[in-house]
Amino acid sequence: MRKIEFFDTSLRDGEQTPGVSFSISEKVTIAKQLEKWRISVIEAGFSAASPDSFEAVKQIADSLNDTAVTALARCVISDIDKAVEAVKGAKYPQIHVFIATSPIHMKYKLKISPEEVLKNIDKCVRYARERVEVVEFSPEDATRTELNFLLEAVQTAVDAGATYINIPDTVGYTTPEEYGKIFKFLIDNTKSDREIIFSPHCHDDLGMAVANSLAAIKAGAGRVEGTVNGIGERAGNAALEEIAVALHIRKDFYQAQSPLKLSETAATAELISQFSGIAIPKNKAIVGANAFAHESGIHQDGVLKNAETYEIITPELVGIKHNSLPLGKLSGRHAFSEKLTELNIAYDDESLAILFEKFKKLADKKKEITDADIHALFTGETVKNLAGFILDNVQIDGHKALVQLKNQEEEIYVSQGEGSGSVDAIFKAIDKVFNHQLKLISYSVDAVTDGIDAQATTLVSVENLSTGTIFNAKGVDYDVLKGSAIAYMNANVLVQKENLQGKVEQISAHDGI
């Protein structure tokens, strides 16, 4: 049975989700969990986009033991140089080169002829192949590319040394039957004396990303690209956890399997949710809270008699656990540090001391501590470090609020606000500290775990009216009002960072496949 390589681009394409911005430490933690999940290749980022993007790719490449690491590069020599430098510390370094091939992209975005595109493919793939052993090539907007020219572009890349050919459905345009035919045509007609592996990369604009990816596998693709929880710009990308479980459950049909350790699926999905600030929908396939819930009495009766009557997937298969951790108020620092290691949470002596102190405070308030609680503690700490501000105090008096913030220079800001309710008053007080032009797009509070004593994660989404950029921010605390203040403070800090730095670092927020 064929084993399909799984290529995760949560840290590159997934981060293009509006409002999502992972810190470097969060990216490294995610990469380590992806390795634990046994992802074949991690696309760690677009290393030429900014110094932070380069550093994130480099740190991930240096941190992993067995997982291949790749960086995205346009068909531009300087991009490739940056990518090569960033991934050189990886045990298995790869480079992913792309250029658009559809008529609309060549005419309006690239403003060059098809002949020039082919010359660029040959030059850049050859240049990359001289520097790393494994090169992947993607013809951007492949599904709107004339089929014979697509074959010509693919053949040019293969002749120049590409081992992997990725066929992106960049705008989520294709259908399963059509996509499968494209793969069969390319696989049958691409000439090479070595093995060439094709892969799908699907966006979910028409809700068919997973179906299209599976159709490509059925047609002969040996690698599949996607993101955890399907995160990504617009409607998102193909959800890798859905593809993996579909291959597992229907291996009789696809005659293929994933390399993933499926029992790490839930933990991986939860980590991405925590760090991205995007809650997993309750009805989400595979990892949603309702994926194994049965409301109908007939269904409940059947499941109690034999789970296979209505469940084709067991919670245990994907690592959904209902037991709490053997950690509590009497647990010591050593046991706590071992749990952090088990959860792939990076720490040093200083951060361990801070996290352990927060853990002990939580254990005094909460009887049962879960993995999600530990992730929430870490998320709250990394967000605070990213922000450079801490919330010293918040006081509520009816519709009035007083907040006290402190920055890294130990400067203290005290502000009062009055609003239609407690949260509105807190936000207005924080607005006076930062004085940004913001629009609050969404505000939500989610319990980290079940129970009346659960920690809460507060999520806010704001628009910087000066630039139109959307930012997601989160605050984690046992107190919902305090968590709300932290989240809104963090959102303001992200806006402040953008206003100070501008967008000069970024090549393009949407320049990718």
From Swiss-Prot:
GO biological process, one term: L-leucine biosynthetic process
Boundaries of every Pyruvate carboxyltransferase domain copy: 4-266
Subcellular location: Cytoplasm
EC annotation from Swiss-Prot or TrEMBL: 2.3.3.13
A molecular-function term among this protein's GO annotations: manganese ion binding
Catalytic activity: 3-methyl-2-oxobutanoate + acetyl-CoA + H2O = (2S)-2-isopropylmalate + CoA + H(+)
Record-listed Mn(2+) binding positions: D13, H201, H203, N237
Enzyme class, first EC level, given as a word: transferase
Pfam families: HCS_D2 (PF22617), HMGL-like (PF00682), LeuA_dimer (PF08502)
The protein's name in its UniProt record: 2-isopropylmalate synthase
